[in-house]
Amino acid sequence: MNHNQMNMHVPMNQVAGAPNVAMQMPVPGPIMQQQSPQQMQPAPVPQQTQQDKMDNISKVKSLMGSLRESIPMTLKSAAQILHQNHNADSNTQKGMDNPVPRFEKNLEEFFSICDQMELHLRTATTCIQQAQSAAHYLPLSVIASRLDSGPTTQETTLSYPQYLKTVGLQISYAKDIHDTLVAAAQNISPPE
C-alpha cells in the first residue's frame, strides 16, 4: 500500500460513550482512544547518527507521525465538546459525568507541532539558499578540515582557513564598494 494513501475504511466509535446517540465519529485504530499525558509522549528514539540529528527534513518527516495523531485528537475533542454542548442545550443529557478531553490542550499541541515543522522547513530553505549562493559566488569545494594542511595543489578545492580568508576578502570588498557608493552619493547631492 502506498504511504501517501489513507485508509478510508475505519471503524466507527460513538461520541462521548452514549449508546443512544446517533452521531458517530470515524476512528482510525488506537490513535483516537483517550490517552493519558504520559502515554502521549513519543517513544524514545534509538540513537541516530550525527547527520540525522542535523537534517531538518528528517526532523519534519519525524514530526509527521505526531501531527497525524494530533489532528484526530483535536478534532475528536472538538466534536465531543460540540456534542456535549448540543446535549446540554437540548436538555437530553442528565449530567456532565463524561469528562471531555481538553480541546485547548490538543489544539495547542497541534499548533506546537506545526510551528516546529515550519521552523525546520524555513531552516532547510535557508540552508539551501546559502548553499546555492556559496556555489554561485565560490564554485570551489571546501575541505571540512579546520587545520591548514599546507597549500592545496588542487585548483578545485580550498582548505577551511583559505575559505575563511576568501570570505573575509569578499566581505571587505563589498564594504569598500558600499562606502564608495555612499561617498559618491554624498558628492552628487547638493549641500543643504
From Swiss-Prot:
<keyword id="KW-0010">Activator</keyword>
<dbReference type="GO" id="GO:0003712">
    <property type="term" value="F:transcription coregulator activity"/>
</dbReference>
<keyword id="KW-0805">Transcription regulation</keyword>
<protein>
    <recommendedName>
        <fullName>Mediator of RNA polymerase II transcription subunit 29</fullName>
    </recommendedName>
</protein>
<dbReference type="Pfam" id="PF11568">
    <property type="entry name" value="Med29"/>
</dbReference>
<comment type="function">
    <text>Component of the Mediator complex, a coactivator involved in the regulated transcription of nearly all RNA polymerase II-dependent genes. Mediator functions as a bridge to convey information from gene-specific regulatory proteins to the basal RNA polymerase II transcription machinery. Mediator is recruited to promoters by direct interactions with regulatory proteins and serves as a scaffold for the assembly of a functional preinitiation complex with RNA polymerase II and the general transcription factors.</text>
</comment>
<keyword id="KW-0539">Nucleus</keyword>
<dbReference type="GO" id="GO:0006357">
    <property type="term" value="P:regulation of transcription by RNA polymerase II"/>
</dbReference>
<dbReference type="GO" id="GO:0016592">
    <property type="term" value="C:mediator complex"/>
</dbReference>
<comment type="similarity">
    <text>Belongs to the Mediator complex subunit 29 family.</text>
</comment>
<feature type="region of interest" description="Disordered">
    <location>
        <begin position="32"/>
        <end position="51"/>
    </location>
</feature>
<keyword id="KW-0804">Transcription</keyword>
<comment type="subunit">
    <text>Component of the Mediator complex.</text>
</comment>
<dbReference type="InterPro" id="IPR021018">
    <property type="entry name" value="Mediator_Med29_met"/>
</dbReference>
